[in-house]
A protein has these predicted regions:
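Structural micro-motif
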Residues: 49-58
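Non-catalytic, surface beta->alpha helical segment in thiol-disulfide oxidoreductase systems
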Residues: 60-88
């Protein structure tokens, strides 16, 4: 089964929501596997037109899954890939 393809759409600096969502996304990586691509809206005119007022945005397999905020647990559910749960 291929890994989910996650695209994190963000911008250069000065985006507190982007920083917070990225931290939650990195935390989710402790529990699920996925491929991550980080895209900056400043460098892609199409992305800028589509998402400038929605960032941060996560696309999962090409579909919008999150905009603005999500917790680690919400991300795990939305990305929903092959789990590799840690046992405490």
């Amino acid at each position: 089964m291929p890994l989910p393809q996650v695209q994190f759409i963000t911008k250069e600096g000065g985006c507190t929501l982007c920083d917070e969502l990225f931290e939650e996304l990195e935390s989710a990586r402790d529990y699920i596997d996925f491929d991550l691509e980080i895209l900056k809206i400043e460098y892609d005119e199409e992305l800028y037109k589509k998402y400038w007022d929605k960032i941060p945005v996560l696309l999962v397999n090409g579909k919008m899954a999150v905009k603005y905020r999500a917790t680690r647990d919400e991300l795990i559910k939305k990305i929903g890939s092959r789990s590799r749960w840690k046992f405490w």
